[in-house]
Amino acid sequence: MPNFVATSLKNLKFPFGADGVEFLWSAKAGDESLIYTKTGKKEFFLLVKDKKTEFVVKSDKLTRPASLGTIQKALSVYKDLNVLDLKSSTIAIKNEKQLAKKEFILNDIQFLEKLKSGEFKKIFVEIGFGSGRHLLYQAKTDENTLVVGIEVYKRSCEQVNNLALSMGLKNVILLNLDARLVMSLLHSNSVDRLFLHFPVPWEKSEKRRVVSAEFANECQRVLKSGGSFELRSDDKNYTDFTISCFLNLKEAKMEIYKNRFLDVSSKYEDRWIKQNRDIYDVVFTNLIVSEQKVLHGDFEFGTVLEEDILSKFENKTIKKDDYFIHMERIYKKDSSEKNGGLLLRVAFGSFYRPEHCFILVENSKASYFIKKPLLTYENLKAHSTLKEYLSCSTS
């Protein structure tokens, strides 16, 4: 990721900025300072690491925007305004493409807003789209269908984003998120087709597989009646495992194929065919209408006193049966006032899809800052425990 190293800084007074980039305030913890940065509608932190003889400046991982160009521009402006002596830099903006908006790459909040619009009557979801060949084929074949791709590798998301732009597509969403998280966000009876093509088998670690008993239940919940989940794999053991998971559902209609020809193939499939490997397809068709999943609650804190937090905060983990809370770090905002404010970095929620958030505490109030948690069962339970911990007076 882009960064630069400086031997000395000007330490300008906040706020300052230029060229559409604003640096509004900072918060410090030990050798780290977080710089609250805004450029257009984007807000995030730059991280300044004091290594005694030099300062390393880069983007904070938790709030990092998807656009590499946005990060590079913010770092470049900060460097030009607040650096006295520069040692090294890897933030050169090579071309305008790096500043271009990643039109199809959405975060979880943007994804939910898109779903609320109801623009498309049909939804396809592909987990692990890789090079995007199959996903783009589906989007091009039926432009009235919203095609959602989930991929953990950011580079793949960026490459497919550029391909979708070049093809002039308007019905694609790319999510650089965990598939289990995305599945939990989808409404019941909302998806027409769900694809999982050539997943990693994880032969020695079944827990890391996409498919599980819980995944099968979630597939049945999110699929419309008549909707389908389609696995395509060259691994017979994974195929058998998938069949067993879906057969454990109360109702299951399944079709199984061997070496079936499809109109589009992935680069992995092309490789396996050249090696004369068998290809297996499992198609599960949903026959039921599921109840809507309704969650009640909010992420408000109420009164929170800074002095109480300062007196009891420690790096600790609270573990419960189905969620956890990790109090990671506390930063103090720079301010001329006595109580300038605190910034807490926390992780919480489900063990397999944790949230990472900042909590801003000032004027006896607390709120999630920049990124709010998703409304999930585990997050609500974790928030309740976190609220109790932060609001509990030590006096």
UniProtKB/Swiss-Prot annotation:
Q: In which pathway does it act?
A: tRNA modification; N(7)-methylguanine-tRNA biosynthesis
Any keyword Signal?
Answer: no
Could you say which residues bind S-adenosyl-L-methionine here? E126, E151, D178
InterPro entries for this protein: SAM-dependent_MTases_sf (IPR029063), tRNA_(Gua-N-7)_MeTrfase_Trmb (IPR003358), tRNA_methyltr_TrmB_bact (IPR055361)
What cellular-component terms does GO give this entry?
tRNA methyltransferase complex
List the catalytic activities from the record: guanosine(46) in tRNA + S-adenosyl-L-methionine = N(7)-methylguanosine(46) in tRNA + S-adenosyl-L-homocysteine
- At the top of the EC hierarchy, this enzyme's class is transferase
Xref: Pfam families: Methyltransf_4
Q: One GO molecular-function annotation for this sequence?
A: tRNA (guanine(46)-N7)-methyltransferase activity
What keywords were assigned to this record?
Methyltransferase, S-adenosyl-L-methionine, Transferase, tRNA processing
Q: What does this protein do?
A: Catalyzes the formation of N(7)-methylguanine at position 46 (m7G46) in tRNA.
- Entries under HAMAP family matching the protein: tRNA_methyltr_TrmB
Q: Identify this protein by name.
A: tRNA (guanine-N(7)-)-methyltransferase
- Origin species: Campylobacter fetus subsp. fetus (strain 82-40)
Q: Quick one: which gene encodes this?
A: trmB
